[in-house]
Amino acid sequence: MQYRRRVLDDQLDELMTGVAALEIVGPRAVGKTETASARARTVFRLDDPGTRAIIEGDPERLVRSPRPVLIDEWQRMPSSWDLVRRAVDAERSPGQFLLTGSASPASPPTHTGAGRIVSLRMRPMTLMERGIASPSVSLAALLRGEAERVAGTTGVGLDEYARQMLASGLPGLLGLSDRSARAELDGYLSRVIDRDLADAALPVRNAPALRRWMEAYAAAISTTTSLAKIREAAGGGRSDQPTRPTAAREGG
């Protein structure tokens, strides 16, 4: 399958010629592993129990393998972060390591990696990345003062724009029917609640209540609302709705 270039690739093109180690962060299935794998000579997938067992027995394999080295789901073995940091301290040549992860480790590394590991965020696919539209206004050019006026057109109508929003920007869902995409997204959300949070040492005591909270929070995106209204929508008059301190904490 031909690799579909992402917006982040422009940053990677530049930074991998000057930075020794890069971390790509973002939600599960957003395309981090595929993008990083396209640039790596060696790939270690630490979500694979067999690979993780080998690396736990010989951690230095991560930093002595042919580079660039991709350490995928590095948070499954938090010590890998410090191994990379020390390797960068020993050799500062650019483009040595790529780290990808979908969650924060239960036991954080002993060092933040500041000055050694640069973090980049990968976001869901834009309409341009999906091949739906071509950009006609550059935000970067506007911020640099290079554009005298803002003018642009698009052939994407409101109905198609709404459909693309509902389809999400996850690359694995491109081309699926609306029903299949909805099923995939429903399963995605269930996995986050039932497994991913627990893997990140964030056990969920009331999965149905958390799901209602997430639905209410999502419905309020890009609106002017209050935490109290989101909390009420999540509770729906039920007795198990989150308390105000819990809602404030979970809502960020």
Model-derived features with residue positions:
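Interdomain hinge/linker elements that couple catalytic modules in large macromolecular machines
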Residues: 135-252
